[in-house]
Amino acid sequence: MSKPAVKSVPSATAKTATRAVNIRQKVKAPKQAKPEAKGRAKPSKDKPRAEIKKALHPRNAHLNGYDFPALYAAFTQLKTFVRPTPYGTLSIDFADPLAVKTLNAALLKHHYGIGAWDIPQGALCPPIPGRVDYVHYVADLLAEGDKSCAMDKARVLDIGTGANGIYPILGCQVYGWQYVASDINAHSLTNVQSIIEQNPVLQGRISLRLQPDDKAVFKGVIQAEERFELTLCNPPFHASMAEASEGTKRKVNNLQLNRGSSVKAAPKLNFGGQAAELWCQGGERQFLATMIRESQMFADQCLWFTSLVSKQENLKPCYQALAQLNVDTVKTIEMQQGNKITRVLAWSFQSAAKRKIWRAEHLAN
């Protein structure tokens, strides 16, 4: 199957551009765009302003929902799970893990040219529209409105790629990025390697690395003299398996309420996830603290560090930790996909001038 055309990133507009923020600015979404804040981040009790995205990214292929006839035409197995809704539309039962996994396989084949994709039972099944949103927004972050930025020359590090390998797959197929994908679970990496081997379009573009230390993030993965334009991460949410199980129960209850159903959902929904994908000691807050601390060790090797932040209350300690480091720019992008709100936290030790030089040296057409 031919590789999808690599997308270029247009100049940022007032609607889509993320905005650099000084750590001393206060949090609240602005009613209208304000000038870019300049200067080096300094210690402060205040937090950067988050720019809110109430819909999917304008370049997101799933902006207008799922075209089920096109999807099951590309991936016939999906048709078994598609059914009409009371609203005259088509959908699947999102409480059925096999239906959700099959939808993902169809989306990856139809939109991204991935002919074979599968995950082990119990592994995290990612919502592709939200995952590719993250990819699009960090592409904007990298380009900073520079039309000459050659996306297919970018090297990207995915921390905790899991068994699904979704960020390397999407980044490779949408922007032509070269990836290093790491994980502490060797079985997860084995599954991603199987996906790569079954899809020639991914071969030679994704390198897998086992993180030998489950308490480290970048140490043990980033090698000496290695350069990355971006790092991505979807951290473990919870601090224990019990907390993760409780979170799953809440999601099940919310799904039942949204469906208006009093019928018990199946015990295993698409809110799956192996232990390392769902929880770690100290939870998301501690994971992010370790990531921020270790990022300083690789300040000159990575242009932008980024991570999803699922819990609003975890932003403040992140801002405080970044304020104590020699961080030049901190950005926060708040994204909304359906009822779910998540955030991309991004920081760079390089000034705007140095980032421009970096792009000219490594990402020029």
UniProtKB/Swiss-Prot annotation:
Annotated CDD domains: AdoMet_MTases
Predominant subcellular localization, coarse grouping: cytoplasm
Catalytic activity: adenosine(1618) in 23S rRNA + S-adenosyl-L-methionine = N(6)-methyladenosine(1618) in 23S rRNA + S-adenosyl-L-homocysteine + H(+)
Gene3D superfamilies to which the protein is assigned, alphabetical: Vaccinia Virus protein VP39
Domain of life: Bacteria
UniProt EC number: 2.1.1.181
Keywords tagged on the record: Cytoplasm, Methyltransferase, rRNA processing, S-adenosyl-L-methionine, Transferase
Subcellular location: Cytoplasm
Gene Ontology MF annotations: 23S rRNA (adenine(1618)-N(6))-methyltransferase activity
Residue numbers spanned by region Disordered: 1-50
InterPro entries according to UniProt: METTL16/RlmF, rRNA_lsu_MeTfrase_F, SAM-dependent_MTases_sf
Family matches, as Pfam families: Methyltransf_10 (PF05971)
A cellular component term, taken from the record's GO annotations: cytoplasm
BP GO annotations: rRNA base methylation
Sequence ranges of Basic and acidic residues compositional bias: 33-50
Family: Belongs to the methyltransferase superfamily. METTL16/RlmF family.
The protein's role, per its UniProt record: Specifically methylates the adenine in position 1618 of 23S rRNA.
PANTHER family: RNA N6-ADENOSINE-METHYLTRANSFERASE METTL16, SAM-DEPENDENT METHYLTRANSFERASE
NCBIfam families named in the record: PRK11727.1 (NF008725)
Protein name, UniProt field: Ribosomal RNA large subunit methyltransferase F
The species this protein was found in: Shewanella baltica (strain OS155 / ATCC BAA-1091)
